[in-house]
Amino acid sequence: MAILNEEWQQLLADYRAYHDNPLCEATHVIGIPMIMASLPAMIVPPVGLSLFTAGWALQFVGHWFQGNPPKFFGDRRNLAVGALWWVDTALRPTGLNTRLFGRPVPPSPTA
C-alpha cells in the first residue's frame, strides 16, 4: 500500500521529470543526504554548516547542468519532495519504491 496520496504522488512525478539530467540527478543523490544529515549535525556547528553549505552548493550546480531553477522556488513542498525523491531513487533497484510510493504516475503537463 502506498504511503503517498495522489497529490504527493503527482508532486513526486513532477519532481522526477524536472530533474531528468543525469548530472543534476547525480548532484541531488549526493547533495540531498548531505543537507538532511546537516540538520542533526548542527549540534556541532562547523560540521553541520559545512554539510549544509556543500549540499546546497551541489543542488545549485545540478540545476546549472539541468538549466532550470530549483523546483522549491515555485512550491516549498518540493523541499520535502526532494527527500522523497531521494528515497524513491535509492529504493528503485529493489522495487520497494513502488510499494511505498505507488506506481509512478506521469508528470503533469506543467511540470
What does each model-identified segment do?
Residues 39-42, 59, 63, 89:
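Structural signal for membrane-spanning alpha-helices in multi-pass inner-membrane proteins
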Residues 51-69:
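Transmembrane alpha-helical segments that form the membrane-embedded catalytic/substrate-channel core
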Residues 26, 48-53:
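Hydrophobic alpha-helical transmembrane segments
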Residues 18-27, 64-77:
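Interhelical loop and helix-boundary elements at the membrane-water interface
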Residues 41-49:
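Transmembrane helix interruption/hinge and helix-loop junction motifs
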Residues 9-39:
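Membrane interfacial helix-start motif at the N-side
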Residues 1-14, 68-111:
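Membrane-proximal soluble regions of multi-pass membrane proteins
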